[in-house]
Amino acid sequence: MLVLGIESTCDETACAIVRDGKDILSNIVASQIDLHKEYGGVVPELACRRHIDLIIPVIDQALNQAKLTLEQIDLIAVANGPGLIGALLIGLNTAKALALALRKPFIGINHVEAHLYAAIMSHPQDFQFPCLGVVLSGGHTALVLIKQIGQYELIGQTVDDAVGEAFDKVAKMLNLPYPGGPEIENLARHGRSVKFNFKAGQVKGRPLDFSFSGLKTAVLYAIKDPKALKEMVLLSSEMTQDIAASFQEAACSDIVKKSLLAAKQYGVNTLLFGGGVTNNCYLRKLFSVANSNLNYIWPSAGLSLDNAAMIAGLGYYRYQLQNKSDSMDLEPLTRTPLQSVKE
């Protein structure tokens, strides 16, 4: 089955064509980083307008790269949430229009679930379920017990900022360019992670939940004069590196600790990672050092950030499970939990 996937949840306009869930024939991603960089983050209105400009050219590129026509596509898959409402509408309405015009089935895909599926696409060997899904991105931080593809139990999540959002906000405090994650990681390589005793937050009675807002505030107090928060302290390059290293250590070690605790509590040996923060080399090193006996499944570089291949790939399996097209009344959802496919 040939599946055309569309992704427009935030600031990437993407289209991909995947055969039978894993064979990627094309994977086109148009990034908006240059558009949003001067604002230090994504501006929803600008993102939406750029999606309108790019969606059709990106679909054409995906078809050309795969050497296929629209008539050869068997299924349309589209991310319908969670994400920015305006951005989601562009992708969803485009998918509906294609499905109607071509008289093909279409299916809505949960963006967070697709991030987890990206790791499966990156490693075509068979998996032993259940396993632990660890979602780490700019908009999401969650621990998910994966019983099978399409069968999930949310066991931990952030109660405030996502870890990727925290990286971006700390980078902005340090006057680093957007996106901040890679900038923090690069600076941290030269810093001393023990210089500042930063700690990620703990949620009372919920040991698998995350909280990064307090960590972010602690960094703010380290940067600014506590008695006059509007006045910036002039940071040396050495101090900037130390702050970056200490922040990264606190955030990553908290993720490792809670992920391994979840794996132990639920008796799983395989951890499946999804989201852009999984590109962080220090995070990967911490996991390997903390427990080298577990099986860590990381997404490949081309599938860790937002892309449409993961949407198309998961769309194939979701369609096999539910065995019917979604309704044309399917709506975009800014917030939507992982949902298991009903038997």
UniProtKB/Swiss-Prot annotation:
One of its GO terms (cellular component) is cytoplasm. Its main location: cytoplasm. GO terms for molecular function: iron ion binding; N(6)-L-threonylcarbamoyladenine synthase activity. Its EC number is 2.3.1.234. Keywords: Acyltransferase, Cytoplasm, Iron, Metal-binding, Transferase, tRNA processing. It catalyses: L-threonylcarbamoyladenylate + adenosine(37) in tRNA = N(6)-L-threonylcarbamoyladenosine(37) in tRNA + AMP + H(+). Binds 1 Fe(2+) ion per subunit. The keyword Iron applies. Substrate binds at V135, L136, S137, G138, G139, D168, G181, N280. The keyword Iron applies. Fe cation binds at H111, H115, D306. It comes from the Bacteria. GO terms for biological process: tRNA threonylcarbamoyladenosine modification. Its cofactor is Fe(2+). It is an enzyme of class 2 (transferase). It is found in: Cytoplasm. Required for the formation of a threonylcarbamoyl group on adenosine at position 37 (t(6)A37) in tRNAs that read codons beginning with adenine. Is involved in the transfer of the threonylcarbamoyl moiety of threonylcarbamoyl-AMP (TC-AMP) to the N6 group of A37, together with TsaE and TsaB. TsaD likely plays a direct catalytic role in this reaction. Belongs to the KAE1 / TsaD family. This is tRNA N6-adenosine threonylcarbamoyltransferase. It comes from Protochlamydia amoebophila (strain UWE25).
